[in-house]
Amino acid sequence: MKIIVAEKISASAVAQLQEPGWTVLTADQVHGKLEEHLETADALIVRSAVQADAKLLEHAKKLRVIGRAGVGVDNIDLEAATHKGIAVMNTPGANAVAVAEQTLGMMLAMARHLCRADALMHAGKWEKKSLQGTELRAKTLGIIGLGRIGMEVARRARAFGMELVAHDPFVSVSVAKEQGIGLAGLDELYAAADYITLHVGLTPQTTGMINQASIAKMKKGVRLVNCARGELVNEADLAQALQQGKVAAAALDVFAVEPPKNSPLLALENVVLTPHVGGSTFEAQEAVGVQIARQVKEYLKHGVIQNAVNVPSVSAEEYATMQPYIVLAERMGAFLAQVSEGSIEEISIRYSGHIAEWKTELIRNGAIKGILNQALEEKANLVNAAAIADARGLRVLESHKAKASTGGAGSVLSIFLKSSSEEHMVKGAVLHGDAPRLLHVDGIDVEAPLERNLIYLRNRDVPGVIGKVGTILGEESINIADFSLGRRAAEKDSEQPREAIAVVHVDGRVPEEVLTKLRTIPAVQKAKAVRLF
């Protein structure tokens, strides 16, 4: 075996790879010759600097695995790696303790004015009165996102005697309760929390979630921490709230643009700023190196796949057949998650027709992935989706009915989603070649494309709704690519308007203010923007 460690990891991590007959080349040994050495390599280990793109992977004639010492895989071309049969693994959670400790450290820095106290002392000033702080004890900490890092923060905050409330639609009440955490909606959390810390991934729904509107719902004097993703915070809105006193202090380790040369936060005294060092501890860097070395070794020796981000457990032929249905399942799941409210408790998937006779694990995982990735900090994929759902206490049920009626579609996929407040069901199929299509939503038949940007409307079936929707979208310069309609069957002898739905495929993102206008149409009961990929 030949293993290339293309970037610096610890000596103990490299030692994990030593086996009789194995050749391990370090970064110094392959410097300037990576492409040449890659021709005969079985494994490649990288951090974030080496770009394992399609061009580099052209040299990988026998490469079996790429190990990323860290979480992000933006520097690895997953499509090219998958096409060449190369497994890609990362090390999620290895730096969770480091980021959690950074979060608590920033909370203490805000509570006790530690940064300003240090600066005053270095300036030769002894100003005790202006530095009186507050305790963390008995304060309420609002945690947005209860993944690995969020849970580590919760454990440490509990030791400080803090009250814990969290928002995470993908964690069950029972799992949260075991950790002494109360679950709440975002608005409820905003209203209750003295401190708020962010630990969610960056999605269309979470981008800019801390903004003027959300800050207005928070307590006066709230303190904010962001050690997750810079783009979660609208920095201009936060700066204004800090200047006005609505937000007492903020602590940020991440920024929308790094380094943040023009951020309005740089000039404010009540802000603690660090240069994206949340995961930068000796222990965390040691942990990611040792963990990826062990994973690569296990894969090369025994074929054991851990923390893979791209590997299906089926043959290439089987994967080619089911791939359109994996896409269908993922988009149906994403659609459901974005039209639903409340904390998700149960996902039920039914396979009807030919699809019921297949190995359906990847299709199931596609559906779970589509649902979970609307809010998760740690991204689910076709390998780990079911495990993440299980760890978060979500029930996942499946049923197979090969002889069920499919209305001529050959195979139909049905997904039921139950949350703490409502239930939804959608059906879909692959039609017109490999096109994923929506066939049914909550008792109403409709055929609609599952494309990138959609608007989902539920309304009373009365004249004028379609025209008003079209007018509003036209006024907002939003182009309609497809307008699919469906309505519930009329009840006998009833004069009440039927319920109808519309799935509108548009050419770009739909701003919240457009949805607000759509909701002003008297007959419209629900208007949601859905972004599928």
Model-predicted regions and their roles:
Residues 1-89, 211, 491:
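An N-terminal-biased, well-structured beta-alpha scaffold segment characteristic
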Residues 7, 92, 137-157, 325, ...:
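Glycine-rich adenosine-cofactor-binding loop
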Residues 50-57, 169-264:
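Rossmann-like adenosine-cofactor binding region
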Residues 27-28, 47, 69-70, 85-97, ...:
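Short beta->alpha connector loops at strand-helix junctions that form conserved
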Residues 84, 88-89, 169, 221-339, ...:
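Rossmann-like dinucleotide-binding domain for NAD(H)/NADP(H)
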Residues 313-356, 360-533:
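A conserved regulatory-domain signal marking ACT and ACT-like small-molecule sensing domains
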Residues 100-119, 139, 158-162, 290-304, ...:
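Oxidoreductase and adenylate-handling cofactor-binding alpha/beta cores
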